[in-house]
């Protein structure tokens, strides 16, 4: 049986009753506390932003990438951010299901990348499952984004401006 962190990344249902759930919540709270600290950092102090983002992600944020605080995140370890990205202020990432952001990606203000959903069964609503979000190179996003893959598109207000469809 997979541990609870692997289950999240594999899209399996995770229940608060499972062994390891407390450790998951502990990690989430620790990440959110670091994000709170990040919210107090000046946007001009990218060195400190990068230090705190490294702590959140569990790996170094590329030097060529800019993140403007405040930045909200529940769990950063399964999140990867490429080179030359620009992430505007007030973005929210729910990263438990995994987020992959390619190179040269622009993410507008208040964008939400949400990888976690709840069970549709009302009797099991507290259980969650993750679905990965993959954003390929040179994408610009200005929406709330649920699990999917986006490539070479400009997303704004739930529409893809490149192909004029709700979904590519």
Question: Across the structure, where does each feature detected by a protein language model lie?
Answer:
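Short secondary-structure boundary/capping segments
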Residues: 5-6, 57, 125, 131-132, ...
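Terminal amphipathic alpha-helical/low-complexity segments used for targeting or macromolecular assembly
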Residues: 1-64
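Low-complexity basic/metal-binding stretches
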Residues: 144-168
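Flexible, glycine/small-residue-enriched loop-and-beta-strand segment within the central core
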Residues: 71-82, 86-152
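Residue-level preference for alpha-helix termini and adjacent loops
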Residues: 13, 23, 60, 70-72, ...
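Short, electropositive, low-hydrophobicity segments enriched in small/polar residues
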Residues: 15, 99, 163-166
